[in-house]
Amino acid sequence: MSAKIPRGAAVVVEAGKVLVVKRYLRQGASAECVMCEYGDVPGPRCDGHRYAVLPGGHVEAGESAAGAALRELEEETTLTGAVDRLLWTGTHNGRPAYYFLISDVDGVPELSGDEAVEHSATNHFELRWADAADLEEFGIYPAALRQHLTRLIEAGDDAG
């Protein structure tokens, strides 16, 4: 059995809000849908999922999780920045996940990369600034992040 590819994620906090990617995903069959698989959705059909994630993605060969977080942040949002520190570790769809606070953020967030190209009626992406209440409403995923992000927002930690 091969090791699961880790995920690096960028935590960008500004003015009491965190940048998230709101998503709607629907596949034809639940067997084709990663959210059905990890959400234990029964049945043959995928009815669709509305949720939000932090900008991030898989760690490429020879890349660190921090490097992946910065690369994915730029690819998905056009923002650049620097890693301030590792905030948390966890899992995302059954693979290791590393969450980094990003500082010295430059630019205006704009949906880009695959998230902009793959926009469709069954695969929709939207960048949003979320406060603590929004995290629940948007369905932050993985759900364990909500508590961590809420504490970070309430502490006013935006890494400058």
Stretch-by-stretch model annotation:
Residues E137-G160:
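Charged phosphate-binding loop/patch that engages nucleotide di/tri-phosphates or the phosphate backbone
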Residues G8-A9, E14, E60, S64-G67, ...:
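Residue-level detector of intrinsically disordered, flexible termini
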Residues C33-M35, L73, P96, A144, ...:
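A generic membrane alpha-helix/interface feature
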Residues M1-V53, G81, R85:
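N-terminal strand-loop-strand
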Residues G57-A82, W88-A143:
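Unchanged
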